[in-house]
């Protein structure tokens, strides 16, 4: 079929030369053309199947390689989506952890502030109580020392009822 197409194509190409009226009897162009067509036909006959099978195998190899690359691309896209999803989850988890840490820090701060306030109030109370006790102790010691000095001086005489009344008024 191909040979027939080649012969017809060759004849169509040579037809303008025949129409011009040139004398080509002195040349061997027709024999050479027929030899070329015969050579091309024989070459085609022997090599066509091998050439077709070679081209088919190359086409199959290329399509296989393309399918492999597309499969790898699909796997890569899926991995990318998976990793992006994991990254989003990690970001959300980090935000949650930070939020919880801030809440916990605030709670701990409030707790220690309250405890410190209570401790300060207790210290103030205790120091006031200690100061009151010390004041009473000092008053008592002062009264005792004054009474002792007065008893020893013998200038002033007190009976027991007078001592009790003075002590009640001063303490």
Curated annotation (Swiss-Prot):
One of its GO terms (cellular component) is proton-transporting ATP synthase complex. The gene is atpF. Gene3D superfamilies: F1F0 ATP synthase subunit B, membrane domain (1.20.5.620). Belongs to the ATPase B chain family. HAMAP family: ATP_synth_b_bprime (MF_01398). GO terms for molecular function: proton-transporting ATP synthase activity, rotational mechanism. This is ATP synthase subunit b. Keywords: ATP synthesis, Cell inner membrane, Cell membrane, CF(0), Hydrogen ion transport, Ion transport, Membrane, Transmembrane, Transmembrane helix, Transport. InterPro entries: ATP_synth_B-like_membr_sf, ATP_synth_b/b'su_bac/chlpt. It is a single-pass membrane protein.
